[in-house]
Amino acid sequence: MRRHATSGLPFRSRTQTGIDVVTTEEGDKPKMTMPEPGPGSAAAALAAFRADLPLKAPNARSLAATIENPGCTARRVLDSAGVDKVALATRIGTPLPQEQSVFAINRGNRFEADLKADDYAALIELLRQAKFEVDRVEILRLRNLYPISPRNPDIALEKRAAATRSAILGMAAGESSAPNLIDGGALRWDFGGAVARLETDGIAWRLGGRIHIIEIKSFPLVDGRGDPEKVGAAAWQAAVYVSAITDMLAEQGFDTNLVSTEVLLVCPRNTSLTPTMAPLDVARQTRSLRRLLAGRRQVGDVLAALGDDATLDTAGMSAEAAATHLADVLERLGTNYLPSCLAACPLAYHCRDRARATGNPACLGPEVRTSLAGVQSLPRVLELAVGASPGAGESDAAAMLMRAARLLRAADSSALVDAR
């Protein structure tokens, strides 16, 4: 099989650490055109479903959040169709406030800029401490090669994906011209019948003879530990990258063990902006990801089952009618609100309102939802607690609720006796 290494005009420099660095920024760029969805194709069905809502391709963070909530079919379809969920939430009338403060964004940008200054000297030093082969580092700088335009980001991501694929296959084939560090790599990944374009922070090669994902985050690591929720989100995000590269190698007949499930997490140390790196094992998340995807219906099948009227097209509708229609489409697709959605999904306020209005136990958290498995509403919880006959699937929850009710009555009786 013929493979092409990414071509370009390299130039050499030396970092403050004395490491020989070769970067590629200019030269012949692989050509790729955007595929047009054919009539009757899954892409055409998704485009018709999206209607006039802005196109926003899912990234690894949004996919990770989708995968963490496998019961939410609506979110998976929206991601597959490239629906801008912020715009959708605004049309429904329940927009979320800005997710991150300007200070946090600026701090993150400064940290990443410092990390990559002087030909990535700080990052290379961290890699060297991790036994990365850094006598000669060849960096493929795809952010410089293909800067993303706000007007049409997909074109740049497609070109980055082509260059990243060529470079990774070159790594796997052991080509001497293959880079050993990719900045701004992009990956194409099929999930449930739709293709996502993913932008990575970094991909490192030849660390223990394997390909490693570099995940750069601005939250601090204190004594080598970070906020569990943020580290967990980073692990899921990195697992998406690992899975995408694994699939790429498998398709071309390469050993998938070339991709390490140990991710290199780079964060500020303590309260400073000094970078530190810690290994992050995402093997569990990668396995869970495979199981979840294997059991899912294809997105095209979901849309076909709903009928032709299940689209986000609101042309000719008043704002109120449009909001009602969009909310109805989400309900038909199937939502699954969890409190964690507030930190991960722009539609969380809408779904929380619906969950509260219908008395969905999920609005009280995943632990409560798990404990009340089989019970569909909070009013039904109260009925079971006072002795209502349990229906199908409600027996375990009913027994637990009745025990809890007896304990509460006993506690109330004891309190009355003490008061006297």
Question: What are the functions of these language-model segments?
Answer:
Residues 2-205:
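Metal-dependent nuclease catalytic cores that hydrolyze phosphodiester bonds in DNA/RNA
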